[in-house]
């Protein structure tokens, strides 16, 4: 019986890990390292900290504000346009994928 229990626990753990790393289809193949680099390079946290105070993380919290992967990508594109960051579409996607992985967790 212990053998079956171990198999079941292993299966549940593997499903949990796969879901933890799952990304929506629009973020599949996004370069997460590039996204992290761009977030640091463009000082996204500093701007968001000025806008919402504290450490800036409250920008991710308003319920229902960003409720789909497409809307998240659109918000990153809006920052890109308004701040004239010059990011290419794949850059915007990479930044949105990192934000999704770290904060929103859309599947």
Predicted segments, located by residue:
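N-terminal export/targeting leaders of redox proteins
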Residues: 1-29, 106-107
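Soluble non-cytosolic domains of exported or imported proteins
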Residues: 29, 66, 70, 86-90
């Amino acid at each position: 019986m212990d053998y079956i229990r171990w198999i079941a626990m292993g299966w549940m753990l593997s499903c949990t890990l796969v879901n933890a790393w799952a990304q929506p289809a629009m973020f599949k193949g996004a370069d997460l390292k590039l996204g992290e680099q761009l977030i640091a390079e463009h000082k996204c946290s500093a701007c968001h900290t000025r806008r919402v105070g504290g450490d800036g993380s409250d920008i991710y919290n308003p319920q229902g504000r960003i409720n789909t992967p497409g809307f998240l990508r659109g918000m990153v594109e809006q920052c890109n346009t308004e701040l004239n960051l010059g990011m290419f579409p794949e850059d915007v996607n990479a930044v949105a994928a990192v934000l999704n992985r770290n904060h929103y967790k859309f599947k």
